[in-house]
Every structure is written in structure tokens, then in C-alpha cells.
């Protein structure tokens, strides 16, 4: 019997890809995918468990589904993803409203779980397969707008940073075979996807587990032969960026000059304690070389404030580093001591102080963004229109310098209707609350 199944995906784009795969699996099994959990037979909450705050968000969503269930507007709740993997016992014992739990190694069991929770008899299955066998490829039902899609090229992580739980939740690093990736990318291009966003926990390591060699540059050259307009890269580790990769990014016009390179900190002692392989000088050298060889490059990074070992001196060093390097985009987060990590056992500043430092870093970054925005006024940029903003009463979109969800937008006027998913040239004329404004030019 077909059931109506609704999916809620939380957390990162990699998790979103897992959700798209589960939707395809459920649909292939004969069930219906519905947008709203209200009135559905089953709601699947695909959780993030990277940070305590992400787990709190997941629990809030589960409790919302539990309320629908209590009101008779939903029949069953299935919890999947990283929080399910990390805290399966807590989910089962503390959330009796949950009818099934699937870990990150068991996404392929989702259709079976739907059938089991809906069957008479009150089964409450818990699937915890080997995380090294997490399904990577296969059919997807895209949940993104038609003009962009993600291509996840690897699963897991071998970096083992002292503050991070990802290897415990996703396993060791596993690259997907290149021919499989090219087949999937070809299907996305044929479906009309214009911006391909290449993702993994660390894309620079791609291929090293297959034959011992870095293969990201070779993969990108093949992807550039397909009918995409933009190819965007998330997340690169600075110590694995090769000369071949830099040359490929610089030479291939479809690869946008926008690189997301998480550094987390710049102090050498902190980097070493956190099991990062970089130093402040090695990071500087990579950034300098990238800017010299890739015209118009926009850099994005991630910063953690309040890491173990960070006193006022180290914090000021971090602020100065951001000012000196003028990194155009940065996500700043307070240190969260995660259970089971080495960093959680180390002495660190109180959460209130980590939050204060986070806010100060955000202020530093805001000044850098304002300076960058002022520097590009008068430029004409190719912008991917994403629709009309009623609030701003203008069209809204992104140039190569703005990635999906995490960066600002460009608000622009035009003398004709611009369709969502259409590229248009925009002259940048002003700024608005840290974002750019402009006028379409034909």
C-alpha cells in the first residue's frame, strides 16, 4: 500500500544529498513524497549532529512532528542522520514519539522502515549499519531550485581534528569512482542544472584513497566538459591544495574563482593542539599563491572562537590575521566542546566568553565585507537571478562571489522581467546592510 511520506532535512548540503537519495528510494518503493508533514502518513526528520546546537534544532523539529502526531495529523515519525547515529539510545528512550531510527550507515533501509512502522503490530525498528557502507550514489529527487544542485564526491573524513565528531558519524574518507560521478553530473546537466556545487567534507583529498594520488583537478576538468555554466567548490583544506589544482581552477572558465577553505584558527600552537596540519605561515602562503594565480578570487573560510588554548593574545592574533588577509567571506562560530572529542577534555574559555569573541570577530569580518563591497562598485557582474524579493521590491540573485545560503545576495532592478535561473549582467551601484545592489544592463 502506498503511503504519503514527508521529509525534513537539517544541517549541511551533504546531509541534504542523503535526504534526496532517501526520497528517491521511498518513491521507487511505490510511496508518495509530499511537501508538508501535516496530513502525511510518515515524517522523516533527517538530522544534523555535528554540534550540540544542531542536536537541539533536531529535537525541536522532532517535537513539532510529535505534536502533529498527538493531534492526529501525522501517523509515524522516523529519525535519520547524524544525531540518530550519535545518540540513537537517547532518541529511542527520551523521545517515545519516534517510531524508527536510522543511522548514517542505513539510509538504504528507509523504504523498509516506512513499511515496518506503518504495519500493524507497532514495530519500532532501529537500523545502525556500518558507517563505512553509507550509500553514496544512486537516484536522487532534487530538493534544490532547478538551477543548482550538489555533487557529493566523497563521504567521511580522515582529518580527525580534535574538536570534530564527523569521523565518528560518517566514517573514514571514501572517494566515489570518477565514472560514477561523471554519470551523475551528466544527468544533472541534462536536467537543466546551471550551477554545480562540488562538495565533500574535504574535496582536496579526492582520489587519494583510490590510487594514492590527488584526482580533484582531473575530475574538475572532466566536469567542465559538461553543460554547466558555473562549477563551485566547497570545502578545500589548505595543506592539500596542489599546483595542478590551482592551475585547473585558473584555466577552466566554468570553475568560479570562489574557494571555501576552512582554517578555524591561525595560531600555530592552537592549530597543532587541534590536530590541524597547517601553520599560520603555510596558510598565508597558500592564500597568497591562490590570489596571485587566480584572477578575481574570492575566499571564504570558517573560524572558531574560543578554542582550547586561546587567550586574549591568541584571539587578537586571529583578529589581526583576518584584517591582514582580507578574507572576503567567513563563517564565525563559538567553540562547542563536543562529547567524545579530545578538545572537549581540554581547558577552554567559558561559553559566554567564546560568544563574546565570536561577536567581535563578526564585527571584524563585517568591516572586511564592507571594504570589499565598496571596492567592486561600478563593476559589471554576471548574476544568476533567483527570483523577485517582495520585501526589497527588486530582483535578487548571486554572482560568482556569493554561494548558496551562506553569503549575501545582490539586489538589482531591470527594465524587463528576469526569470529565476536566468543569467543577467548587473552593474553594481550600491550597498545595503552588507549586501550589494545594482542595475541590470543588456
Positions of the model-derived regions?
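Short glycine-enriched, charge-decorated loop/helix-capping segments at active-site entrances
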Residues: 49-50, 170-171, 210-213, 272-278, ...
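Conserved SAM/AdoMet-binding glycine-rich loop
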Residues: 77-79, 86, 190-313, 323
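Short, hinge-like loop/turn segments at secondary-structure boundaries
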Residues: 95-96, 117-120, 214-216, 249-251, ...
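Terminal RNA-binding accessory module
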Residues: 337, 345-442
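Proteins enriched for Cys/Gly/acidic motifs involved in redox and nucleic-acid/cofactor modification
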Residues: 1-206, 244, 259, 281-292, ...
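Conserved, mostly hydrophobic/aromatic
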Residues: 181, 198, 233, 261, ...
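Structural recognition of alpha->loop->beta junctions
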Residues: 93-109, 217-228, 251-256, 317-329, ...
Amino acid at each position: 500500500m502506498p503511503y504519503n511520506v514527508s521529509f525534513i532535512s537539517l544541517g549541511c548540503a551533504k546531509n541534504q544529498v542523503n535526504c534526496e537519495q532517501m526520497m528517491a528510494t521511498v518513491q521507487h518503493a511505490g510511496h508518495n513524497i509530499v511537501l508538508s508533514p501535516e496530513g502525511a502518513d510518515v515524517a522523516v526528520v533527517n538530522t544534523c549532529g555535528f554540534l550540540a546546537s544542531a542536536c537541539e534544532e533536531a529535537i525541536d523539529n522532532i517535537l513539532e512532528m510529535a505534536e502533529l502526531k498527538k493531534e492526529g495529523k501525522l501517523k509515524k515519525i522516523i529519525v535519520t542522520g547524524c544525531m540518530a547515529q550519535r545518540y540513537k539510545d537517547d532518541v529511542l528512550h527520551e523521545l517515545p514519539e519516534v517510531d524508527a531510527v536510522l543511522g548514517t550507515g542505513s539510509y538504504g533501509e528507509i523504504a523498509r522502515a516506512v513499511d515496518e512502522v506503518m504495519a500493524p503490530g507497532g514495530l519500532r525498528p532501529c537500523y545502525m549499519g556500518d558507517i563505512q557502507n553509507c550509500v553514496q550514489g544512486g537516484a536522487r529527487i532534487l530538493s534544490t531550485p532547478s538551477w543548482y544542485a550538489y555533487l557529493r564526491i566523497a563521504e567521511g573524513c580522515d582529518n580527525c581534528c580534535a574538536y570534530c565528531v564527523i569521523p565518528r558519524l560518517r566514517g573514514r574518507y571514501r572517494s566515489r569512482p570518477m565514472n560514477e560521478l561523471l554519470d551523475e553530473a551528466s544527468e544533472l546537466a541534462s536536467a537543466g542544472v546551471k550551477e554545480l556545487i562540488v562538495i565533500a567534507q574535504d574535496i582536496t583529498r579526492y582520489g587519494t584513497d583510490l590510487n594514492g594520488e590527488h584526482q580533484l583537478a582531473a575530475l574538475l576538468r572532466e566536469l567542465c566538459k559538461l553543460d554547466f555554466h558555473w562549477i563551485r567548490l566547497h570545502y578545500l583544506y589548505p595543506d592539500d591544495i596542489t599546483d595542478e589544482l590551482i592551475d585547473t581552477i585558473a584555466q577552466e572558465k566554468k570553475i568560479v574563482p570562489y574557494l571555501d577553505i576552512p582554517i578555524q584558527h591561525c595560531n600555530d600552537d592552537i592549530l597543532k593542539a587541534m590536530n590541524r596540519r597547517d601553520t599560520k605561515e603555510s596558510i598565508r602562503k597558500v592564500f597568497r599563491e591562490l590570489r596571485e594565480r587566480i584572477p578575481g578570487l574570492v575566499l571564504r573560510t570558517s573560524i572558531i572562537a574560543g578554542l582550547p588554548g586561546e587567550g586574549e593574545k591568541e584571539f587578537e592574533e586571529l583578529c589581526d590575521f583576518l584584517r591582514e588577509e582580507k578574507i572576503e567571506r567567513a563563517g564565525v562560530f563559538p567553540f562547542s566542546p563536543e562529547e567524545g572529542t579530545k578538545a572537549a577534555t581540554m581547558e577552554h574559555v567559558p561559553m559566554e566568553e567564546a560568544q563574546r569573541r565570536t561577536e567581535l570577530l563578526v564585527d571584524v569580518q563585517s568591516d572586511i565585507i564592507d571594504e570589499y563591497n565598496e571596492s567592486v562598485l561600478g563593476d559589471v557582474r554576471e548574476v544568476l537571478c533567483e527570483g523577485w524579493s517582495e520585501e526589497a521590491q527588486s530582483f535578487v540573485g548571486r554572482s560568482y562571489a556569493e554561494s548558496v545560503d551562506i553569503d549575501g545576495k545582490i539586489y538589482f532592478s531591470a527594465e524587463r522581467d528576469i526569470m529565476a535561473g536566468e543569467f543577467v549582467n548587473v552593474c553594481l551601484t550600491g550597498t545595503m546592510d552588507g549586501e550589494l545592489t545594482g542595475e541590470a544592463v543588456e
